[in-house]
């Protein structure tokens, strides 16, 4: 008899039980791993699968996490073969060419479209009922690409969008007011990145509108220069890339925040990228961030934001910029 047989006596033969809330992370780069660790530490799933084309890096990252199994409740698996991702509830796509210092998110686009042509069909093959969450940049265009390539209904394809931009915005407003970001209610909508739209008209603390107190807030004529905060939000990622070479932790936490709302069916409102055709005067088939309700079925509802004419105009301009790039893509 083996040591195992001497130690343990079987009472019954177990039937294999599938995971109820499996999450897959595609791409084990900086963002993928920050997303993975954030999901693990929030204890959001009973199985986490990781997949990447770089076999050694993938194997190393999976082993490193598995060595911490004692401190976790999640089974961790990884393989370059997409069968490892089978029956996922949520699939987070972080894979793609990395943004270089000074490179705009839109510049990355065709490089990443070609990568998606391999990734998306594989995800669909093994998890036909999953919710697809796109994080790779430029996120709004690549969410559109994932939607087109997957054939999924729009409520099951979500871009991480301006969830992080809004978090940066709330952090910086909190710094200026000496308040915790959770008490500063503020939204950034539109494109994730350079042409994002800060909704100054909606910024409030405890229901008190800041623009009600300072009607010039967010404009050139504002003596307190609140507008600089939005510039800091836009420049924030570039600054971090300049200093440490890439962004990872905040986007990882943002991804886990979105995954939690889906897995736990929280019906929480997040600014995420969805098909906005027909909203706020947008005519083209583009994905942009607006406040959306996330739950177990994916994106269940969109909140109708009251935007000022100037804010709506900026949103439409964002849509035109994205459509200009999208219509040139070869899918």
From Swiss-Prot:
Keyword tags: Cytoplasm, NAD, Oxidoreductase
Signal peptide: none
UniProt cross-references to Gene3D superfamilies, sorted A to Z: Lactate dehydrogenase/glycoside hydrolase, family 4, C-terminal, NAD(P)-binding Rossmann-like Domain
Organism: Chaenocephalus aceratus (Blackfin icefish)
Metabolic or biological pathway, per its Swiss-Prot or TrEMBL entry: Fermentation; pyruvate fermentation to lactate; (S)-lactate from pyruvate: step 1/1
Gene: ldha
Residues given in the record as NAD(+) binding sites: 29-57, 98, 137
Function noted in UniProt: Interconverts simultaneously and stereospecifically pyruvate and lactate with concomitant interconversion of NADH and NAD(+).
Sequence positions that bind substrate: 105, 137, 168, 247
A cellular-component GO term for this protein: cytoplasm
Predominant place of localization: cytoplasm
Class of this enzyme: oxidoreductase
Biological process according to GO: lactate metabolic process
GO molecular function: L-lactate dehydrogenase activity
EC number: 1.1.1.27
Protein name: L-lactate dehydrogenase A chain
Active site: 192 (proton acceptor)
Catalytic activity: (S)-lactate + NAD(+) = pyruvate + NADH + H(+)
PANTHER family with a match to the protein in the record: L-2-HYDROXYCARBOXYLATE DEHYDROGENASE (NAD(P)(+)), L-LACTATE DEHYDROGENASE A CHAIN
Transmembrane segments annotated in the record for this chain: none
Entry annotated with the keyword Magnesium: no
């Amino acid at each position: 008899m083996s040591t195992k047989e001497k130690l343990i006596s079987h009472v019954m033969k177990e039937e294999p039980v599938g995971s109820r809330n499996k999450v897959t992370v595609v791409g084990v780069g900086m963002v993928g791993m920050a997303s993975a660790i954030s999901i693990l530490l929030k204890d959001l799933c009973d199985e986490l699968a990781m997949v990447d084309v770089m076999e050694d890096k993938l194997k190393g990252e999976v082993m490193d996490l598995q060595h911490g199994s004692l401190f976790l409740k999640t089974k961790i698996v990884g393989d370059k073969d997409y069968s490892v991702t089978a029956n996922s509830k949520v699939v987070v796509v972080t894979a793609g060419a990395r943004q270089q210092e000074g490179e705009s998110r839109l510049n990355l686009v065709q490089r990443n479209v070609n990568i998606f042509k391999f990734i998306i069909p594989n995800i669909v093959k093994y998890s036909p009922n999953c919710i697809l969450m796109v994080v790779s940049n430029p996120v709004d265009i690549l969410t559109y690409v994932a939607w087109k390539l997957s054939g999924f209904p729009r409520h099951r394809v979500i871009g991480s969008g301006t969830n992080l931009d809004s978090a940066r915005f709330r952090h910086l407003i909190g710094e200026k007011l000496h308040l915790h970001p959770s008490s500063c209610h503020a939204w950034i909508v539109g494109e994730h990145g350079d042409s994002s739209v800060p909704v100054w008209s909606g910024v409030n603390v405890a229901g008190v509108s800041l623009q009600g107190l300072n009607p010039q807030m967010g404009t050139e004529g504002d003596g307190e220069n609140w507008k600089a905060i939005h510039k800091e939000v836009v420049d924030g990622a570039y600054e971090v890339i300049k200093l440490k070479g890439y962004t990872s932790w905040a986007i990882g936490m943002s991804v886990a925040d979105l995954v939690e709302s889906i897995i736990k069916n929280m019906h929480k409102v997040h600014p995420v990228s969805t098909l906005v055709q027909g909203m706020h005067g947008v005519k083209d088939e583009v994905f942009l961030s607006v406040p959306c309700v996330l739950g177990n079925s994916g994106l269940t509802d969109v909140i109708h934001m009251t935007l000022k004419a100037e804010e709506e105009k900026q949103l439409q301009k964002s849509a035109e910029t994205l459509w200009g790039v999208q219509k040139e893509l070869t899918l």
